Amino acid sequence: VREYTSPSTAAAGPDTDRRGGLADDVVEYAAEQPDRVAFRRRSPGADGPGWSDVTAATFLAEVRQVARGLVAAGVRPGDRVALMSRTRYEWTLLDYAIWHAGAVGVPVYATAPVDQLRWILEDSDAVAAVVETPALGARVRESGWPDGERHLWVLDDADGPGAVAALTELGREVDDERLERRRTSVQAEDVATIIYTSGTTAHPKGCVLTHANFHRGLGATLAELHELFADEDASTLMVLPMAHVFARVVQLGAVKARVTLGHTPDVRTLPADLATFRPTFLLGVPRVFERLVNAASQQAASEGRGRLFDAATETAIRWSQALDRGRVGPVLRARHTLHDRLVHARVRELLGGRCRFVVSGGAPLGERLGHYFRGIGVPILEGYGLTETTAAVTVNLPDTLRIGTVGRPLPGTSVRVADDGELLVRGAQVMREYWQDEVSTAQALPGDGWLRTGDVGEIDDEGFVRVTGRKKEILVTTSGKNVAAGALEERVRDHPLVDQCLVVGDGRPYVAALVTLDPEAYAGWAADRGLRGPLSAHTDEEALRAEVQAAVDAANATVSQAEAIRRFEVLPDTWSEETGELTASLKLRRNVVHRRYRDAVERLYD
């Protein structure tokens, strides 16, 4: 199929026709259900994180107080205000306060280096910035921020009141009528936010998203995923960086759907936060869920139950695959029942014990991971979208789940496969433009109504979309063979020891790979085998190479011989946002890795 359109339906909800701004949602929430717990605010404690309830009425009052401060500070309608923080309650509070004041939010990853930060602040012409810590404030100043001319507030300010308290005090003289004029003057077609893309290969581009983009995209998404919000006590825990479009959509969707929302600032604290927050569903990128499974595997190994966990994992995957075939044999059924009681129930408890579904986006989900989660009773609903499409374009649904695909287009959305295999998208959620970048806008939106996504994929006869890679990730070997690097990398990363993988081979005689290991998984693996010393002393260890070879073999089994990884090198390093090899959404910065590991790549072709 070359094109598939999901027709708009009345079920897409009233949000698709909203005329005002996103701050209206908070006002309506407080008017309709003032005492409902809209948020649970994280507070660290000696025995783990605690949570304090924030009602819809309290949240609205706080939003108004901060919005008054922004107005008093001279922030005008349409002005850009930058937010730079980890994931926390105050981000959502500030986001809505900025919209209530008629301004535009510009999210910045807390890990953004100075050069990228300078670009975003200058390109957006932000008039004010709110950062989490004094250290981030220093980074903003280092980027060239004109301190005396533009406001800079710090949430956790050691030398004075934090940003929220300072803005609240500043806005005491702003009356209700003036504040309400700001909110009610916002129209759906006004700009809500400028989100800068991760910039895996070049300067980040600012995606201009309107209030209408969010209203219409979320109207369709919430209607399609209504089963997630059916529980009266539906709740979810935000694990994504708030600068990610997916996170912004989650926060907005939680308010629209009356879902209790919590925030966790660090994936390393996620297990403890899940245990105390106990969400009914989760949303995140695949790497988050891979880490949760790896943590469960390591815990089982430390308790002497590693082999049982591995056997249960294979049972879960086979169970899910059997569901796809429509036939579960009696032996598999009995084994699944046993492993569910002994192992899977414990994994579900690691998710908080109440989690019924997981929604994954932002990066490709490996099929093994998808089958594993469905096999343990917590299906992953994989979707697809971009910053340019206000997140979701397609999504799998609980009753029409097809693992290995990203689902069907949302109502009112069309997906087309171009002649060169690129996926094109049309719908009300597509961005207006790239901020102050006519050339890039014309390339992405050439005037025919279709957004060029840069992704390559296919559509089956029932409208399910499969993303096979990025156009820029297609390698062409000297024999002329096209290789989808991303798909191979994803399958190598399925191995619990592997953290990251970069497939190379463009203009080369064969395909090869650089592999890094998960530090925690490697530490457990090495301890079990009595290996001492740093990883750098063991990268050529026969047993370790055999493990990585198994990961490579599993990936190679899915492609032709000409596309298979022929050689690999295990690196002693860990790639991260901090060291620059990964974006904040945990995607590879290919140009950075190629530049830093040029010698290692050359060794693969010696």
What annotation goes with each model-predicted range?
Residues D35-Y96, P113-R118, T168-G171, H211-A212:
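Conserved AMP-binding/adenylate-forming core of the ANL superfamily
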Residues D53-A57, A192-L218:
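Conserved AMP-binding A3 loop
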Residues A72-A73, H100-L170, E547:
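Structural core segment of the AMP-binding/adenylate-forming
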Residues D79, A110-E142, G217-L237, V267-F281, ...:
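Conserved ATP-dependent adenylate/AMP-binding module captured primarily in the ANL superfamily
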Residues S43-G48, S52, G137-A188, A296-H344:
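ANL superfamily adenylate-forming
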